[in-house]
Structure formats: C-alpha cells, structure tokens
C-alpha cells in the first residue's frame, strides 16, 4: 500500500472515530490497514471518543416510515436527548440512512449496519462519525422492511414530530384506506391487530369479568332468553376488547364504523401493521445534572 493510501485510511479513521492522528495510525498498523479491524482496536484500547459513548443510553430520536414501488420500511434512529434529535445534522443522517435502507436488501439489523453509501462508508461507520461529530451516542436501534405486490395497498404515516411511524399493508382496498388505518394506529396504538391474536387466558379473564358485570348491572339479565344473554355478553366483551384490538375499534376518522366494518365495506383485508414509537421498551436513565456537572468539574481540575 502506498503512503498516500495509508494517509487516506488514517484520515478516514479519524473522521469516523474522532481519535487522535497517532492513535489512528497505530490502530491501522496493528490491523493491516483494515478500517473495521482498526475501529475494533480503538474500541478495545479506549482511544475513540465516539466509541467511549457506547455504554450510554440513547432513548430519544426519530422514527421514519418510507416506501418505494416495491418495498416499505420503518426504522428508529436514536440519540441521547431530544435536543439532538431536532438537530439538522441528525435529521439529515436519518434521511440518508432511510434512503440506503430502502435501496438495499438485508436480512436483519446487523446486515443493515453493513450497507455502504456512495463513498464506501457503512451505516455503522456513519453512526460512529455522527456520534463523534454531534457528541452524543447515535444508534440505529431497529428496522422493519418488506416487499409488496401490486395486489396490495401499502401506505406509510410518520407523525409530524417524528416520534411515531406506521406502515399498513392491505390485501385489496386502496391507498386512502391504508393511510386512514396507519393514522388510526398511530393515534390509538392498539395492542393487537385482530381479535384472534388475543391470548386465551386474557379472553377468559375478560369473559368472567363481563359475566359478573352483566348479572350485576343488566336489569333481569338472568331472566332473559339464552340467545339474548349471549348477544349482550358478546357486545360487552367486544366493547372491552376494543380498547386494545384494532379491528374492533371505532375508526379514528369515522367513529360510526369499526375498523373491521370499514375494511369490509372497501373489500380490504389487513395483512400487516407495524408501529414504531421512539424509545418504547427502553429503560431511560435518570440523570442527576448537578452531580454530573460536579463530576465534570472535578475531572477538569485533575488535568
């Protein structure tokens, strides 16, 4: 490898890791000038400013849903604070990653992180570079992507604040119907899509609850014909299930019909709904800012 090529590698590694020139040179020399191996070397030796942030919790950020003529995807890009998530550099990174993901095939998140841009930088490298540049841990937490056919109606919805994104795939129907379902799911966040998805244990629990309520609150319930009692119980059970089952919920854009009826009226069937919300499932860190500032002052005084 020529000296010019070596210097180019050092420059690239410095951009990615924000580590000093000497450390980048040493890392590459110890890694046969392989960038990925050099990044690992810096990480193991604690030389990368960006990689030192790897143990921090990134629970803020943005989600985005995108589609083209063949594929649809939704992904979550995280930062440590919502302030950084509003930074134009972060937004530009999100858009770039979205374009790369949509244009590439990958099996899982690990594969997605290996996708390269036009300059030969992987998404993983872009994240490390952003971490070094912005000063917070930046991560691609999760991504869902699938292909679809002409027989399907597919629409995406990303809420204006970038905190919620939904994709809806229907068999039949049209884009307007798929869009309405996406907006409904974004707003109400149903736990289940179909009634049949609700676990039997939960259904039995609800049934017992509803039966007790019917005997206590419905006048002369025990004297009514069996078919009437069954109808009353079904209505009460469905009402309770509608709190968390999509198909039983009144449509957000037209409460006169349930989602199930709305789809049936438009010859559409739900095939897939995916909803991402920023930070869901992440245990956020409680930061004592006073203690953090004092610690930084003490570290500064030691220098």
Curated annotation (Swiss-Prot):
Tagged with keyword Cell membrane: no
Stored InterPro entries: EF-Ts_dimer_sf (IPR036402), Transl_elong_EFTs/EF1B (IPR001816), Transl_elong_EFTs/EF1B_dimer (IPR014039), Transl_elong_Ts_CS (IPR018101), UBA-like_sf (IPR009060)
Keywords per UniProt: Cytoplasm, Elongation factor, Protein biosynthesis
A Pfam family assignment: EF_TS
Signal peptide: none
Localization terms from the record: Cytoplasm
Gene Ontology molecular function terms on file: translation elongation factor activity
Region (Involved in Mg(2+) ion dislocation from EF-Tu): 81-84
Entry GO terms, CC: cytoplasm
Family, as annotated: Belongs to the EF-Ts family.
Function in brief: Associates with the EF-Tu.GDP complex and induces the exchange of GDP to GTP. It remains bound to the aminoacyl-tRNA.EF-Tu.GTP complex up to the GTP hydrolysis stage on the ribosome.
PANTHER family: ELONGATION FACTOR TS (PTHR11741), ELONGATION FACTOR TS, MITOCHONDRIAL (PTHR11741:SF0)
Annotated protein name in UniProt: Elongation factor Ts
Organism field: Mesomycoplasma hyopneumoniae (strain 7448) (Mycoplasma hyopneumoniae)
């Amino acid at each position: 490898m020529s000296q010019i090529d070596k210097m180019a590698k050092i420059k690239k590694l410095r951009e990615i890791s924000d580590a000093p020139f000497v450390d980048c040179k040493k890392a590459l020399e110890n890694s046969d000038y392989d960038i990925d191996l050099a990044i690992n070397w810096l990480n193991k030796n604690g030389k990368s400013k960006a990689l030192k942030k790897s143990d921090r919790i990134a629970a803020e950020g943005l989600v985005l849903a995108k589609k083209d003529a063949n594929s649809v995807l939704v992904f979550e890009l995280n930062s440590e604070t919502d302030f950084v998530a509003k930074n134009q550099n972060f937004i530009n990174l999100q858009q770039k990653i979205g374009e790369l993901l949509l244009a590439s095939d990958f099996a899982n998140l690990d594969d997605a992180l290996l996708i390269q841009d036009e300059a030969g930088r992987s998404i993983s490298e872009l994240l490390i570079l952003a971490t070094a540049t912005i000063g917070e841990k930046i991560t691609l937490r999760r991504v869902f992507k699938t292909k679809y056919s002409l027989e399907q109606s597919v629409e995406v919805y990303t809420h204006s604040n970038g905190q919620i994104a939904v994709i809806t795939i229907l068999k039949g129907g049209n884009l307007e119907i798929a869009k309405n379902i996406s907006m409904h799911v974004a707003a109400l966040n149903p736990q289940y899509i179909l009634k049949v998805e609700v676990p039997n244990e939960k259904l039995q629990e609800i049934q017992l609850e509803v039966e007790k309520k019917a005997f206590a609150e419905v006048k002369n319930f025990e004297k009514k014909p069996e078919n009437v009692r069954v109808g009353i119980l079904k209505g009460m059970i469905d009402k309770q299930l509608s709190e968390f089952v999509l198909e039983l919920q009144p449509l957000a854009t037209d409460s006169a019909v349930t989602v199930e009826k709305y789809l049936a009226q438009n010859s559409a069937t739900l095939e897939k709904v995916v909803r991402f919300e920023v930070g869901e499932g992440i245990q956020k860190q409680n930061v004592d800012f006073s203690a953090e500032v004092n610690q930084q002052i003490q570290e500064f005084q030691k220098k």
